[in-house]
């Protein structure tokens, strides 16, 4: 394919990036009660809630944040009383993160928002199309992670 025949808007990576940005715009966690959290904080809360206990490095990786973004989100969530840090026994420099009781309540709201957002995104797809889409996205992710 030459540059003359290239169509940026039909490029898979361009489409996926645009879709990710559109999803982020729909990820409004600011109305959550009893606290307001950012999109990054919402992802961190969801990752910890789903996995139960993780290190800061694991959280950043699973939430697709760089280490500094992950650390800022963790500090903010600790300050808001939504997650707690416990020093790891095997490494005094490392901490395990888990949800507090208040964090578990907010996590339930975050999950409800994620499910609602997924329902909106997939509403015109049949169950078979939804499964096919997820399978294809998983294959693409595998290709990129292993290349």
Where in the sequence are the language-model features?
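Short capping segments at the starts of secondary-structure elements
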Residues: 51-55
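Charged, amphipathic alpha-helical coiled-coil/dimerization segments
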Residues: 24, 30, 75-138
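Residues within helix-turn-helix
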Residues: 56-57, 68, 75, 95
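C-terminal regulatory/oligomerization modules of transcriptional regulators
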Residues: 1-5, 128-147
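N-terminal leader segment of winged-helix/HTH proteins
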Residues: 1-35, 82
